[in-house]
UniProtKB/Swiss-Prot annotation:
Transmembrane segments: none annotated. Pfam families: SUFBD_core (PF01458). The lineage of its organism: Eukaryota, Sar, Alveolata, Apicomplexa, Aconoidasida. Residues 500-525, 938-970, 1111-1153 are annotated as: Disordered. This is Iron-sulfur cluster assembly protein SufD.
Length: 1462
């Protein structure tokens, strides 16, 4: 048999022996006691007898029976029967003898120490066990000493000796060894101590030996071989031992904590507690490898450890250096020696100095190989892949597909467009496949995406929460998350009043003991710590007094546990929970001390808030929303928030990665720019005022004006009579003397307070008052052109005729306001800028408003005259006031233009609900109270009818139930709009919590036979079965967007919630939800404008930069010649400048200036050249005439690209109606980043929802949005979206309904420049009599690209279905492109209608020509055509501001067009 096979068999034989691999777990600490300790825990139950003879795998040299040890010493000293010969013979039987030194080891050490590697066997053993420096201190006994073993020559002798050793172990008696080793922790300590005792040396130096197994086998095999065989042997053998060789071969850290000698007088419990302590080194393998500069550490195994950066804080420069050196992809010197191009990544790392507590920047750089570009045809056809993986066309079977760790793996990324054949390495990870230097990249393929694309590392590690602290994630316990539902009932029982009363006395005793401990210890948080286990209490003991107190506590806890032995379940719960809670709270308090009571780590956020010790907000300095959950870990909502994040992380792992080719074909977008961006969490911290959001808020036409057009003729007949009444009322000014004070052109008053103000005529052109407070303000005619009041508070305001041109009220608070025309106080009206009228051309519009029917009249003499006039005028105008407003014919068009705001606007800033920017909550509270009163009235009526039918005996019982139900219903809220963390009702929280976990195409897998098909041709077979849903097939489902939605859930900060109860009609009102995406680019723009005013603010500091440079080899001669030529050209330019200046300017003063300038330029250029030449000469000497590399700057990342994850949940109960308007905006058009949105909408039976969505983000923003709808029985859902902004936007709409439901979808997208907007729609018909109507339109200009795909699936049970889909897209110029793909999948035959279509065309020429014949220019004619094309979608939108923005963008398209001749 050849020697090569022998070596392999020996290696496998040793691997199969027990506990061989276990040793590698403890090599890191280099403490062999841990090997024995692990066996001790597993074999505590085994009791050894004298007759038992253990095998090799059960052999153990550690034993902790101290009682027998004492007896043995006493017997030996008393009798002295044991002689030296008997001892000598026993040791021979056990282990053998070598020159008087007795070898005694673990079973693995025993084998390898006794192997006769050479003929000089005795000398080897003497070298091993002879120790130097015997006079060392005993504490240094655990220092490491390497074995020095000579190389073996004969392999056959090794085999024979191993078999002999195994046979000897079977016949050994273990009790004899135990009696001799009881006093020592290790076998080696025993024999070394005996030698020291024989030599009369009291100082003991204990050796612990480190067996380098890999070096042993490597030396055994490689010796006495030829050089050729040695090379082959090394390559073959390193395949088996590569991991161990890199990680464990040279790792020898020193343990900081060292075990002291164990005293014989200690108890068994103390000994066990010391055995349980494992001496694990604080040194990391990476740090140790960096200290030893012999060989650089470039293995790929530790990159997974490095990828978890977000769990640690790199605040020191040394840690940053370690991270940089571990991430160096290539060695610069070796790469330059090969004359290959490479890239340098320079990054300025921002860290915090722990001493000064200031943010500083530290620049570092690392090197990455540059891949060579080439031309290749990218298509979806399969290609032949060779087995060597060295060809550039390596697609499917590339090892990079298996080694990449990112979710966006190389399988789902591809590029399209003109530049698809020229791609750099740092743009897309698919370039690994197109590399000539493929063998060099195998070394870095495991962490390729992490280092080439920091944004992918950022997405996968879910580092999107800037507010959340990293330390909190380390503190959280999975125990509370897993056992929350199971222990909920038991906790209620434990916290019941009976149990609390019994435990009050015990708590008082514990508090007294804790107070005593605080006087002795430095830890101020020992009050809350209740030690339960000996392990936790023995760790931190300050003084002897503390130890006595701890023992006193143990006795108390044991007494309490003895009392509760009846209920074992309660005992387990109480012990586990109290243990976890005390440690958890203690760590939180230490965490607060670490940051000096500042909860947040980021300096910017710390300056914005003030806290208590509890973490509660005291005072807000800035208007930036931060939920209290991030500050209070004890909040019950904190647990639910962490569960949401963990469920998103698990879903992200479970969702399969889609196929590269299929996803690229579906996406139809060049993803190169997406992977080129460096995403971060750089959101803006500036104050956003409400005035900035005025243009983006809703502007709705009031429908009451349209209804009054029918009554215009009746109003005109009564207008003359009203005018006469006004003239009569003007003559009655003398009735009240106090009114004369108010008859003036300009009345300015800050505070006007009057209990009773009675006036028939109040005439004022300008009345300006900040605060007008009056209990009773009675006036027949109040005429004012401009009345401006900030705060007008009045209990009763009675006026028959109020005539004014412009009334601007910021805040109007009325206690009793009863409008006959059904106008609520929540709706505030405002006028546009076009309605301003000059003082010269004033026109009175008579508006008769009957504000209140019940008037509060005082007992005054003047009021009697007023009451008579009031009654006469009321009778005349009673019929008119009940029907509608009185309008003048000249101002009917003006009244139609009056608008109203949305009922309530909710603002979400960077994924967090902002209560400051949103409207007042009292608006919702007032509406909630009104709805509750209506529901009570309706219930009382129903109950009365039921009680009449029932008997008197039954009435008593029913009344009690009715009262209880009413009491619960009053607590329930009928409407809720706000943050999920502010929900207080249990029912609302339960319903919305279900919908938060929903992820499209992942949560739907609960259906039968809907598992996704990832490989093979299973997708075709799924069509044969009715129960299978091909919608979730691998070829049809969109797993890429499912990953984005799971990422949104994993990085959730807050959630906007809209809830509506049953039987509520809010079809007249709109709820507007605004999602703002900010960036620090806005802060930079504001700072440039306000540098003089804001010099003291430290919030806006220098941010990190990220640059990429390309290094290309070049010849030295060319560079030198180019430098000299540039230097000569500069001199010539200076001389030419001097000549021209002499000719033009004859003044001597100007000549001297020009000469001085040129002289200075020459000096500077010559100085720079000398420095460059010196550097070149030095580099030439060092590099030994190697090629020089020129550096070219490729990219520069100064812009900030934040990631925001907005989330919306809408839940509408049965028989209710509501209008929701969702808008995504960015206040600065130059913003960039990623907006990953998700909205979930649920409808119950017979509900109606109108949902509009507008997207107006920055020009460089990537927008991905999932909209999932669950339509109810006989419910109606209408979806309208308008897409205007962003660089690339994609919207997925998925609707699933029930029987008799109806859904409508209307969309519009306007594209310009290089925008890419795509919309994907899915309508799934699973139940009968469902109806869908869909229409989408596109206007594409410049080089933009539009994508539309719809899919309608009708299952077998969905009978009598209606489905209509249509897309119309218009290309305005050459270079624009569009893709429209409608699909239908129909299984049943009983269908009423199913249509689909798509058109892509230019603007029609015939209607444009017909408009031009009527004198209209070509641009205006095209604008008219585009407006008519867009109007069909805009008719479904009620926001006038959004319509105006659409028309403005259409006007841009028309102006870009160049005229042409027909």
């Amino acid at each position: 048999m050849p020697n090569i096979f022998l070596s392999n068999y020996i290696f496998i034989f040793i691997l199969l022996t027990n506990k061989f691999l276990k040793t590698f777990d403890y090599v890191e600490s280099k403490h062999w006691n841990n090997i024995c300790l692990k066996d001790l825990y597993d074999k505590n139950d085994i009791k050894l007898n004298k007759t038992n003879k253990l095998k090799l795998k059960y052999k153990n040299f550690m034993f902790s029976d101290l009682k027998k040890q004492k007896k043995r010493k006493e017997t030996e000293t008393a009798t002295g029967t044991i002689t030296q010969k008997q001892k000598h013979t026993k040791k021979k039987k056990l282990h053998g003898q070598t020159n008087g030194y007795f070898i005694k080891r673990n079973k693995i050490q025993h084998i390898f120490a006794n192997i006769p590697y050479n003929n000089n066997f005795k000398k080897i053993n003497q070298d091993i066990y002879t120790f130097k420096n015997v006079n060392y201190h005993p504490k240094n006994a655990n220092k490491k000493v390497y074995l020095k073993i000579n190389n073996a020559t004969h392999l056959e002798t090794i085999k024979t000796y191993i078999t002999k050793c195994i046979k000897n172990y079977r016949h050994q008696n273990e009790e004899k060894t135990q009696k001799k080793i009881r006093n020592y922790n290790n076998i080696i300590q025993y024999y070394v101590s005996r030698k020291n005792n024989n030599n009369n040396n009291n100082n003991r130096f204990i050796h612990t030996y480190n067996m380098l197994f890999i070096n042993i086998f490597y030396n055994i095999i490689s010796k006495n071989r030829n050089e050729k065989k040695k090379k082959n042997r090394k390559t073959d053998f390193q395949k088996y031992l590569r991991k161990y060789e890199e990680l464990y071969q040279k790792f020898t850290p020193e343990n900081d904590a060292e075990n002291n000698d164990i005293n014989n007088d200690k108890n068994n419990s103390d000994l066990i507690s010391q055995i349980n302590k494992k001496n694990i080194s604080n040194i990391i393998i990476n740090e140790w490898c960096l200290r030893n500069n012999n060989e650089k550490y470039n293995s790929t195994l530790m990159y997974d450890y490095i990828s978890n950066m977000h769990n640690t804080e790199y605040q020191d420069i040394t840690c940053v250096n370690n991270f940089i050196k571990n991430n160096e992809m290539i060695e610069k010197e070796t790469w330059e020696h090969k004359q290959k191009p490479y890239l340098t990544y320079k990054y300025e790392f921002k860290y915090r100095d722990p001493i000064n507590r200031k943010n500083k920047l530290y620049q570092y750089e690392y090197y990455i190989p540059k891949l060579i570009t080439y031309e290749e045809d990218i298509s979806t056809e399969p290609k032949f892949v060779p087995s060597n993986f060295k060809s550039p066309k390596c697609y499917n079977n590339s090892p990079v597909n298996a080694l990449t760790t990112s979710g966006f793996s190389s399988r789902n990324i591809d590029t399209f467009g003109k530049e698809r054949n020229k791609i750099y390495s740092f743009n897309t990870p698919t370039d690994v496949k197109r590399n000539i230097f493929f063998d060099d990249l195998i070394l870095i393929s495991s962490s390729y995406n992490q280092h080439f694309f920091p944004n992918l590392n950022f997405l996968l590690n879910l580092h999107t929460l800037q507010i959340l602290i990293r330390d909190k994630t380390a503190i959280e316990t999975d125990y509370m998350i897993d056992k929350f539902d199971q222990l909920k009932e038991k906790l209620i029982q434990i916290n019941s009043p009976h149990v609390i009363d019994n435990n009050q006395n015990d708590d008082i005793d514990n508090n007294n003991n804790n107070n005593n401990n605080n006087n002795n210890c430095d830890n101020p948080y020992n009050k809350r710590i209740i030690p339960i286990n000996n392990k936790s209490t023995n760790n931190d003991a300050c003084t002897i007094d503390n130890i006595s107190n701890i023992q006193h506590r143990k006795n108390q806890t044991n007494d309490q546990n003895n009392k509760s032995k009846d209920d074992e379940i309660n005992e387990e719960i109480s012990s586990n929970l109290t243990y976890k809670k005390t440690l958890f709270d203690d760590k939180i308090q230490l965490f607060k001390n670490k940051y000096d009571k500042n909860i947040l780590d980021d300096k910017d956020f710390v300056q914005l808030w003030k806290y208590n010790e509890k973490g509660e907000i005291v005072e807000t300095i800035n208007k930036i929303p931060i939920p209290k959950i991030y500050l209070n870990i004890d909040d019950p909502k904190y647990l639910s928030w962490k569960i949401l994040q963990n469920s998103g992380k698990t879903a992200f792992k479970e969702i399969p990665t889609p196929n590269r080719k299929l996803e690229a074909w579906r996406q139809q977008v060049n993803l190169k720019t997406f992977y080129k961006q460096n995403f971060d969490s750089s959101i803006s911290l500036r104050n956003i005022s409400k005035e900035e959001l005025v243009d983006y808020k809703m502007k709705i036409v009031d429908n009451t004006f349209e209804k009054n057009e029918k009554v215009q003729n009746d109003i005109s007949d009564h207008f003359d009579n009203i005018k006469m009444d006004n003239q009569q009322n003007e003559e009655k000014v003398e009735l009240n003397e106090n009114i004369n004070y108010y008859n003036s052109d300009n009345i300015n008053g800050d505070n006007i307070n009057g209990d009773n103000i009675n006036g028939d005529n109040i005439n004022g052109d300008n009345i300006n008052g900040d605060n007008i407070n009056g209990d009773n303000i009675n006036g027949d005619n109040i005429n004012g052109d401009n009345i401006n009041g900030d705060n007008i508070n009045g209990d009763n305001i009675n006026g028959d005729n109020i005539n004014d041109d412009n009334i601007n009220d910021d805040n109007i608070n009325d206690v009793n306001n009863n409008h006959n025309n059904n106008h609520n106080s929540d709706n505030h009206y405002y006028y546009g800028d076009t309605h301003k009228i000059n003082n010269q051309n004033k026109k009175n519009v008579n508006e008769t408003i009957n504000i209140s029917e019940n008037t509060n009249m005082d007992d005054n003499n003047n009021n009697e005259i007023y009451s008579q006039n009031y009654k006469e005028q009321r009778i005349k105008n009673q019929d008119i006031s009940n029907n509608a407003y009185n309008f003048n014919k000249e101002h009917i068009d003006k009244c139609k233009r009056k608008y109203k705001k949305a009922f309530y606007t909710l603002v979400v800033r960077d994924g967090i609900v902002d209560e400051y920017l949103s409207d007042d909550i009292n608006i919702l509270k007032n509406l909630d109270n009104k709805l509750k009163k209506k529901s009570e009235i309706n219930q009382n009526k129903e109950n009365e009818n039921e009680n009449e039918n029932n008997s008197q005996s039954d009435n008593n019982t029913t009344k009690q139930h009715i009262q209880d139900e009413q009491g619960t219903e009053q607590k329930k809220s009928k409407i809720f709009v706000g943050s999920f963390f502010n929900v207080k009702d249990v029912e609302i929280e339960y319903l919305i919590n279900k919908e938060l976990y929903f992820i499209p195409e992942h949560s739907n897998w609960y259906k039968t036979n809907t598992q996704p098909f990832i490989r093979g041709q299973i997708g075709k077979q799924s069509r044969k079965f009715d129960n299978d849903y091909p919608i979730y097939d691998y070829r049809k489902s969109d797993f890429g967007m499912a990953k984005f939605s799971s990422l949104n859930l994993a990085s959730i900060k807050d959630c906007a919630v809209v809830y509506l109860d049953e039987n509520i009609d809010l079809s007249d009102k709109f709820i507007h939800v605004i999602f703002i995406a900010t960036s620090k680019n806005e802060d930079i723009d504001n700072n440039n404008n306000n540098n003089d005013n804001n010099n003291d603010n430290d919030i806006y500091e220098k941010q990190s930069k990220y640059n990429v440079y390309e290094n290309i080899p070049s010849n030295n001669k060319q560079t030198n010649s180019n430098n000299n030529s540039e230097y000569n050209n500069e001199q010539n330019n200076c001389s030419n400048k001097q000549i021209t200046n002499d000719e033009q300017n004859d003044n001597e003063y100007e000549k001297e200036e020009s000469i001085q300038k040129c002289h200075m330029e020459k000096v500077i250029s010559s100085h720079d050249d000398t420095i460059q030449n010196c550097d070149i000469e030095k580099n030439e000497c060092k590099e030994n005439k190697k090629s020089k590399y020129t550096q070219i700057k490729l990219t520069e990342y100064h812009t900030h690209n934040p990631i925001t994850n907005p989330r919306l949940v809408v839940y509408v109960k049965g028989n209710s109606k509501i209008n929701i308007y969702e808008s995504h905006i960015s206040l600065n058009k130059s913003n960039s980043g990623l907006v990953n949105g998700f909205s979930r909408i649920c409808l119950e039976e017979k509900s109606n929802v109108k949902h509009t969505l507008s997207q107006e983000l920055g020009n460089n923003v990537w927008h991905f949005h999932n909209v999932s709808v669950k339509n109810g029985l006989n419910a109606n859902y209408k979806f309208v979206d308008v897409l205007l902004g962003s660089l690339s936007s994609r919207i997925n709409l998925q609707i699933e309904g029930e029987k008799g439901c109806k859904q409508e979808s209307y969309g519009l997208s306007l594209l310009e420049d290089k925008q890419n907007i795509s919309q994907y729609e899915m309508f799934h018909h699973e139940h009968p009599s469902m109806e869908t109507n869909q229409l989408f339109k596109c206007l594409v200009s410049d080089k933009a690209h539009a994508v539309w795909r719809s899919r309608g699936r009708i299952e077998r049970n969905a009978i009598k279905a209606k489905l209509n889909t249509l897309c119309k897209s218009i290309l305005l110029n050459f270079g624009a492109s569009a893709v429209c793909i409608p699909t239908l999948e129909i299984i049943p035959s009983d269908i009423e209608c199913a249509n689909h279509g798509a058109t892509i065309s230019d603007l029609e020429k015939e209607p444009i020509f017909s408009l031009m014949t009527r004198g209209i220019s070509e641009r205006n004619a095209r604008e008219i055509m585009m407006n008519s094309f867009v109007k069909e979608i805009l008719d479904h939108i009620s926001d006038e501001n959004l319509k105006n923005r659409v028309y403005q963008k259409v006007l841009k398209f028309s102006q870009k067009y160049k005229s042409s001749t027909y």
